[in-house]
Amino acid sequence: MARRTAPSKARPARTRKAALPSPEARRIVVLSRNPNLYSTRRLAEAAKKRGHLLRIVDTLACGIMVEPGRPALIHMGEELKDIDVVIPRIGASITGYGLAVVAQLEGMGIPVLNGSRAIAQSRDKLRGLQVLAQHGIAVPRTVMARDQTDVKDAIRRVGGLPVIVKLTQGTQGIGVMIAHSMKEISSILDTMWDLGQEIILQEFIAESKSSDVRILVVGDRAVGAMRRTARKGEFRSNIHRGGEGERYYPTKEYEECAVGAARALGLQVAGIDLLESASGPKVVEANSSPGFEGLEGATGLDIAGLIVEHAARIARAPTRA
């Protein structure tokens, strides 16, 4: 009688570590909810062209494992490993969880381009302006309005009507309004406060003529710039609001202002928006996940390649089998 052999236990398949094609190659992860977004696709193309291995990971598909001495990120049932550097592309709608994921990566000792603290500071318009002002960076006069009793004094302090009204959270020109009268301001503020929003009032810089300058900073360099002009009947110059962009060659003053703003906020990649005032450039916003389709189109520059090259420079040296 033949002896029965016990069925062998199936061993879980091991994920093979992807071989790096050269000593200079790096394993790059881009945190992005949508792999088809222009900026995400361009980063993937630029990494491939330079011989790096790039993986796109959905931020919201990451699980956070908190354990003393062994922090981990879980993705599709497995711990994320063998990462040399991460480029976070965190959308405004998922800022809270996105910051937690980036902070977890920092706790794992993985270089990130940008860090959680830098992203958090730049996402809050008031906090960002506070940091910039503390570092001597020129910004528009700004007051936070808490209730209607503060409004008249706030308007006086920022230079009078018209005045810019902004939500402290918001991107792509969303939540930015202009008010020409007390009636307009009162109506806007009451509506926003009823919705639980926090509001800042900001001086209107007439000489900017419904245009601004976007300078992209990578590392410690201003690598590209464009002037954005609002479409007719609109004062917001954001490309997402229908503004038009054209290549701009910034002066040394503008470059130093943009690089200084990024450095003050701790951003290694930043879209710095500046208004041209009579007293010189003033920073109105810093974007920690700047889109660059408009900038590449206006300038012909390989912005994605510059970002990937900087990511590779700050990456940790990979372990090799």
Language-model regions, residue ranges each:
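Active-site nucleotide/adenylate-binding loops and adjacent lid/helix of ATP-dependent enzymes
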Residues: A2, S22-K48, L54, M65, ...
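Glycine-rich, highly charged phosphate/nucleotide-binding loops
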Residues: L60-D82, A92-G98
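Short glycine-rich anion-binding loops that position phosphate/pyrophosphate groups of nucleotides
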Residues: G91-S93, T168-G170, S289
